[in-house]
């Protein structure tokens, strides 16, 4: 029998696997889907913001960004807050591409949200955020490894 913690990890892993499957169905890699998803749903972001929000390696995000820039789907602009950082901006071609890729997933998420209900979704989000906050605290305080 699985413990609650194992169920949480299992559900999280399964969700990631399903988003990876969605990316494959949509004809992109998981990291590309997450970058497009971020830009489509959250607007102008930096690579760092995407990396942190979606738990992607900085180099992975950088590789996706380079590919999207090369394909003329994305352009980079200097950040007003920090000139060392670049803001990622979808081009007109990029906006159309991102919508084509991300919209089917957003519609599916919308149908799922309706099935689950707002209250349950809010509880799920709150509990998951709390779990992550407490796990991060534990990690920052140092795990006790015993060989």
Q: Language-model features: where?
A:
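N-terminal leader segment of winged-helix/HTH proteins
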Residues: 1-26
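Hydrophobic recognition helices of helix-based DNA-binding modules
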Residues: 15, 19, 72, 98-101, ...
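N-terminal helix-turn-helix DNA-binding core of bacterial DNA-binding proteins
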Residues: 17-60
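Charged, amphipathic alpha-helical coiled-coil/dimerization segments
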Residues: 66-126
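C-terminal regulatory/oligomerization modules of transcriptional regulators
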Residues: 119-147
């Amino acid at each position: 029998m699985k413990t609650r913690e194992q169920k949480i990890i299992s559900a999280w892993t399964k969700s990631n696997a399903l988003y990876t499957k969605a990316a494959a169905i949509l004809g992109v890699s998981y990291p590309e889907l997450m970058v497009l998803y971020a830009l489509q749903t959250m607007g102008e972001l930096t690579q760092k913001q995407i990396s942190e929000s979606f738990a992607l390696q900085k180099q992975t995000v950088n590789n996706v960004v380079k590919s999207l820039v090369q394909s003329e789907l994305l352009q980079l602009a200097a950040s007003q807050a920090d000139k060392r950082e670049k803001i990622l901006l979808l081009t007109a071609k990029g906006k159309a591409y991102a919508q084509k890729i991300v919209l089917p997933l957003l519609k599916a998420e919308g149908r799922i949200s309706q099935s689950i209900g707002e209250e349950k979704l809010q509880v799920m989000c709150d509990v998951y955020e709390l779990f992550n906050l407490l796990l991060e605290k534990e990690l920052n305080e140092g795990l006790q490894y015993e060989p």
